[in-house]
Design a protein with these regions (language model features):
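Extended recognition/assembly regions associated with phosphoester-bond processing machinery
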Residues: 1-20, 25-39, 128-132, 142, ...
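Conserved beta-strand hairpin/beta-sheet module of binuclear metal-dependent hydrolase folds
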Residues: 2-61, 154-158, 164, 188-199, ...
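Active-site regions of enzymes building and remodeling cell-envelope glycoconjugates
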Residues: 60-67, 123-125, 141-143, 280, ...
Length: 292
């Protein structure tokens, strides 16, 4: 499962080769995340890259950047350089950081070319505000949430729009349904399924501010600190400690919590042992650490 060096830390060689099903959803996910090191995840079924702290050979349809800290965005110029489509490359960032991201990308491409007059082309930087919904493709909505971090930061909810047959037509045969459709009868209702939400750097306050987050099938969320002795650092740096998060994991057993962004002070083996112990103590299994 892991690509590791002898000391138990990961190399970057096979990060994108390993893929796992995101529980409770129809999607799979690959990527890597460690606090103050690098974070990036890719969902191939949607063509969405979340954050760009790692270069990738994938050609995503859209990149959703949570915030401007370098471990979440430093490899964005390389991601753009590797873009293989003729379609404009879409990069979403917090609205307050749009101008700075444009400057960063232009400066990067000027360094690549040793030409101070060039600017990045074929790339659309879009600044999104929190608490908004944006259409993506035919049946996906992306909803933004405001994280509580030291800089402007967005979480991204993935919502799937489906058509569900109205109750009064459930007993109808396929032939009768086809005839109704031909006659222009509206036989379905639109429903919206909250598939998963990707929460980058934040304090625990995001769950207090947005109770609707627990309506998602899966929550990808940072859990930077684990040890009791590290508890003070969570509010200090606006991150999350396990002791703050566990109450919600227990309260919402139908939601799967994928935990990311562990501090580099913890080796993989320590993280695995920690959560194995917690599973045994709590008697629940609706959470998993991501350590690829």
């Amino acid at each position: 499962m892991f690509s590791q060096t002898e000391d138990g830390q990961n190399t970057l060689t096979h990060i994108w080769d390993y893929r796992e099903k995101l529980p409770n959803t129809p999607y799979t996910i690959s990527g890597h995340s460690r606090a103050a090191e690098r974070t990036s995840f890719y969902v191939p079924e949607l063509g969405i890259l979340f954050d760009a702290g790692i270069s990738t050979y994938h050609s995503p349809k859209i990149v959703l950047i949570t915030h401007c800290h370098s471990d979440h965005c430093c490899m964005l110029p390389m991601v753009i350089t590797n873009w293989k489509s003729s379609e404009p490359f879409r990069v979403i960032v917090p609205f307050s950081q749009k101008t700075m991201f444009n400057k960063y990308l232009n400066s990067s491409f000027q360094l690549f070319t040793e030409n101070s007059h060039v600017s990045v082309t074929g790339c659309n930087i879009e600044g999104w505000e929190p608490n908004m919904e944006y259409n993506f493709g035919k049946n996906i909505l992306i909803k933004t949430y405001k994280c509580d971090h030291s800089v402007g930061c967005l979480a991204y909810g993935i919502i799937e729009q489906r058509n569900k047959l109205k109750d009064e037509y459930r007993t109808f045969s396929g032939k009768d349904i086809a005839l109704l459709r031909k006659d222009g009868v509206s036989i379905t209702n639109e429903i919206y399924l909250k598939q998963f939400v990707y929460i980058g750097d934040t304090s625990i306050k995001i769950f207090e501010n947005y109770p609707e987050l627990f309506e998602y099938q899966a929550i990808i969320v940072e859990c930077t600190y684990l040890r009791n002795c590290d508890e003070e650092f969570a509010p200090m740096h606006k991150h999350i400690h396990w002791k703050q998060l566990v109450q919600y994991i227990v309260k919402y057993p139908e939601v799967h919590f994928m935990l990311i962004h562990f501090s580099m002070r913890y080796k993989n083996e320590e993280v695995i042992d920690f959560f194995n112990e917690k599973r045994s103590q709590l008697g629940i299994s609706n959470f998993s650490p991501w350590l690829n």
